[in-house]
């Protein structure tokens, strides 16, 4: 074999070809690296990289090994390339300076001046002065106490100027919401001599006089066994206008009249209209039935305030011209004992509102003089009531003494089989019976869902955790099973509340009246029940989100629709605990944060607690407002740890 042939074979070997290619690639890399390193500097990275000298040394080692086989080509002359021109000077347009604080030196683009006024009105009219400064970003002056005349102030129900402008009050318009344009800018003071409320269940029977210092009810209703004063306390014997011998005996009579009512099982959520001091609801609670007691403000002086001080679920509400703030098919039983409402006026529109809220198959219990007295005018009222209830397909199932009980049908079959032209008519198919925020009552019969939603809920306590069928009718963005969403929410809040009970010793708080400002499906309230805290929760569904209120009632809980840009319809000093989960991050573009927290303070009892779970970015502002109000406030990590984007602001209101 010739030597030249051997050399040719070596040149053709794949090994040599790879080595030459690698050497060429290495030289190209060095050239490019040197070229770009002259023009750019690299930002800091979260991980280390090797220096260029080390890379060069490694590449030179590879080149030397290749040179032993084939000679390297002569070095190429380095090209002289001028660096790229510097970028143009950037004009600072941000509102954050180099220290990360707000700056007053920035530029903005063109804008429409009118849009600024619209934005101000959209975020709420606040009379509380809030300041921005480069040093702290947000400041608020310490808030002062209101005048003593506002001790029992409910902003949207005590707007005397607006009420005086009403052209007509025949239907009770003066008792409806009329919110002032100017928001509250001070703190509601407690009455002189205010004490920490007596704890439940003792509060069912007695409360401190100084906490609700009003004697008119004693003067008006003392003879009916409602209430009496004993030294420094009000005492509640448990009677009422139609049940002088006590609410317990009255409830026994109802149970005997309607065995299927089964309080605490089939009948879990009830509504008591014109509740007096709420003895009916107070005694139903020991039968495992939660009763929402409602009455207008000051028909009898502060009756709802007495109910709340006793620890009974209650809310100021009136049957006038607008729908009440509860969804369709909310209550298994609706009760009216001498509630002084003319159910047959205006073609029965008020009873049609009761029908909207009454669950299919539910009971309407009416204890009134027309049921049992024989005066001509009362007998005429009874005949009108019988005629109206017959036309809306209610069945009179029992009349005994002064009590009459009707039952609502389970479906629409009776409605559609009525004679043509029978009034009231069925509501239009496109009517939403759960649309209640500032919506007028309608003179029509609310249709029942053809699929039976709302009628076939489980019995208590299983219904608390059984996803109701009406869950499928909620208008919401859901890409996975809605039942799984509800169950996941319940698991989440059970874990969270369990940690609150363990770490912050909630059982020592002796909570009774609780407000959840953004309730979702009611998971927070369900967790309180599961963990054995003897309290009731007012579950609020904000108008800005999905209307989950029907699901809350189907679970055996209670709540209402509300817009937190406006005050809530309750008395000052209502709640022991106010809970707000991600409320401010959702509402900050619509509402004034300071106004919301002032409203929270109005509703919070002295000695009460506020738990705000929200975005870390809002905590500084929320904490400053809390301190301006006078709360003791501290920010805490969640169970996700210190690096999570969520924090808990815990506040206490001093007595």
Swiss-Prot record:
<dbReference type="InterPro" id="IPR029063">
    <property type="entry name" value="SAM-dependent_MTases_sf"/>
</dbReference>
<feature type="glycosylation site" description="N-linked (GlcNAc...) asparagine">
    <location>
        <position position="62"/>
    </location>
</feature>
<feature type="glycosylation site" description="N-linked (GlcNAc...) asparagine">
    <location>
        <position position="592"/>
    </location>
</feature>
<keyword id="KW-0325">Glycoprotein</keyword>
<protein>
    <recommendedName>
        <fullName>Probable methyltransferase PMT10</fullName>
        <ecNumber>2.1.1.-</ecNumber>
    </recommendedName>
</protein>
<keyword id="KW-0333">Golgi apparatus</keyword>
<feature type="glycosylation site" description="N-linked (GlcNAc...) asparagine">
    <location>
        <position position="342"/>
    </location>
</feature>
<dbReference type="GO" id="GO:0000138">
    <property type="term" value="C:Golgi trans cisterna"/>
</dbReference>
<keyword id="KW-0812">Transmembrane</keyword>
<feature type="transmembrane region" description="Helical; Signal-anchor for type II membrane protein">
    <location>
        <begin position="16"/>
        <end position="36"/>
    </location>
</feature>
<feature type="topological domain" description="Cytoplasmic">
    <location>
        <begin position="1"/>
        <end position="15"/>
    </location>
</feature>
<dbReference type="Pfam" id="PF03141">
    <property type="entry name" value="Methyltransf_29"/>
</dbReference>
<dbReference type="GO" id="GO:0008168">
    <property type="term" value="F:methyltransferase activity"/>
</dbReference>
<keyword id="KW-0735">Signal-anchor</keyword>
<dbReference type="InterPro" id="IPR004159">
    <property type="entry name" value="Put_SAM_MeTrfase"/>
</dbReference>
<dbReference type="GO" id="GO:0000139">
    <property type="term" value="C:Golgi membrane"/>
</dbReference>
<feature type="glycosylation site" description="N-linked (GlcNAc...) asparagine">
    <location>
        <position position="456"/>
    </location>
</feature>
<keyword id="KW-0472">Membrane</keyword>
<feature type="glycosylation site" description="N-linked (GlcNAc...) asparagine">
    <location>
        <position position="411"/>
    </location>
</feature>
<feature type="glycosylation site" description="N-linked (GlcNAc...) asparagine">
    <location>
        <position position="288"/>
    </location>
</feature>
<dbReference type="GO" id="GO:0032259">
    <property type="term" value="P:methylation"/>
</dbReference>
<keyword id="KW-0489">Methyltransferase</keyword>
<keyword id="KW-1133">Transmembrane helix</keyword>
<feature type="glycosylation site" description="N-linked (GlcNAc...) asparagine">
    <location>
        <position position="125"/>
    </location>
</feature>
<comment type="similarity">
    <text>Belongs to the methyltransferase superfamily.</text>
</comment>
<feature type="glycosylation site" description="N-linked (GlcNAc...) asparagine">
    <location>
        <position position="167"/>
    </location>
</feature>
<feature type="glycosylation site" description="N-linked (GlcNAc...) asparagine">
    <location>
        <position position="54"/>
    </location>
</feature>
<feature type="topological domain" description="Lumenal">
    <location>
        <begin position="37"/>
        <end position="655"/>
    </location>
</feature>
<keyword id="KW-0808">Transferase</keyword>
């Amino acid at each position: 074999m010739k030597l030249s042939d051997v050399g040719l074979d070596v040149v053709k070997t794949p090994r040599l070809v790879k080595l030459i290619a690698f050497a060429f690639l290495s030289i190209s890399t060095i050239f490019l690296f040197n070229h770009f390193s002259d023009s750019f500097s690299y930002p800091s990275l979260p991980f280390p990289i090797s220096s260029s000298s080390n890379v060069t040394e490694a590449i030179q080692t590879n080149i030397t090994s290749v040179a032993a086989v084939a000679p390297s080509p002569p070095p190429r002359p380095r090209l002289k390339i001028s660096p790229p021109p510097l970028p143009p000077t950037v004009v600072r347009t941000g509102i954050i300076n180099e220290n990360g604080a707000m700056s007053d030196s920035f530029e903005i683009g063109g804008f429409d001046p009118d849009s600024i006024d619209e934005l101000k009105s959209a975020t709420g009219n606040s009379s509380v002065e809030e300041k921005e400064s480069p040093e702290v970003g947000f400041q608020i002056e310490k808030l002062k106490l209101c005048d003593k005349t506002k001790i029992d102030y409910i902003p949207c129900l005590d707007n005397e100027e607006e009420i005086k402008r009403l052209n007509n009050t025949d239907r009770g318009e003066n008792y409806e919401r009329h919110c002032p344009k100017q928001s509250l800018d001070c703190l509601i003071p407690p009455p002189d001599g205010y004490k920490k409320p007596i704890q439940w269940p003792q509060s069912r029977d007695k409360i401190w006089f100084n906490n609700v210092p009003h004697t008119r009810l004693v003067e008006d209703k003392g003879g009916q066994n409602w209430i009496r004063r004993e030294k420094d306390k009000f005492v509640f014997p448990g009677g009422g206008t139609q049940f002088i011998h006590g609410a317990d005996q009255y409830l026994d009579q109802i149970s005997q009249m309607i065995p299927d009512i089964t309080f605490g099982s089939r009948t879990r959520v009830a509504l008591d209209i014109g509740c007096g001091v709420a003895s009916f609801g107070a005694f139903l609670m020991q039968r495992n039935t939660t009763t929402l007691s409602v009455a207008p403000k000051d028909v009898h002086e502060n009756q709802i305030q007495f109910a709340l001080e006793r620890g009974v679920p209650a809310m100021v509400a009136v049957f006038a011209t607008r729908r009440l703030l509860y969804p369709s098919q909310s209550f298994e039983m609706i009760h009216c004992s001498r509630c002084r409402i003319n159910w047959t006026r205006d073609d029965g529109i008020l009873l049609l509102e009761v029908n909207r809220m009454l669950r299919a198959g539910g009971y309407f219990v009416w204890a009134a003089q027309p049921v049992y007295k024989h005066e001509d005018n009362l007998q005429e009222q009874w005949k009108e009531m019988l005629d109206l209830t017959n036309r809306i397909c209610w069945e009179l199932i029992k009349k005994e003494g002064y009590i009459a009980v009707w039952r609502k049908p389970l479906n629409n079959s009776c409605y559609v089989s009525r004679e043509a032209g029978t009034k009231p008519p069925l509501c239009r198919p496109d009517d939403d019976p759960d649309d209640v925020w500032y919506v007028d009552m309608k003179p029509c019969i609310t249709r029942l869902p053809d699929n039976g939603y709302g009628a076939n809920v489980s019995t208590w306590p299983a219904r608390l955790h059984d996803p109701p069928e009406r869950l499928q009718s909620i208008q919401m963005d859901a890409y996975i099973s809605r039942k799984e969403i509800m169950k996941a929410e319940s698991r989440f809040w059970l874990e969270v509340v369990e940690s609150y009970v363990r770490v912050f010793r909630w059982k020592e708080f002796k909570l009774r009246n609780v407000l959840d400002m953004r309730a979702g499906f009611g998971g927070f309230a369900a967790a309180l029940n599961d963990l054995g805290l003897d309290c009731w929760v007012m579950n609020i569904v904000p108008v800005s989100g999905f209307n989950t209120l029907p699901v809350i009632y189907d679970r055996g809980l209670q709540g209402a629709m509300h817009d937190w840009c406006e005050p809530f319809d309750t008395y000052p000093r209502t709640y022991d605990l106010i809970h707000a989960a991600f409320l401010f991050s959702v509402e900050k573009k619509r509402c004034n944060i300071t106004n919301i927290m002032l409203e929270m303070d109005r509703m919070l009892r002295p000695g009460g607690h506020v738990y705000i779970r929200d975005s870390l970015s809002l905590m500084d502002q929320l904490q400053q407002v809390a301190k301006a109000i006078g709360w003791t406030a501290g920010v805490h990590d969640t169970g996700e740890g210190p690096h999570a984007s969520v924090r808990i602001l815990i506040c206490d209101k001093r007595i």
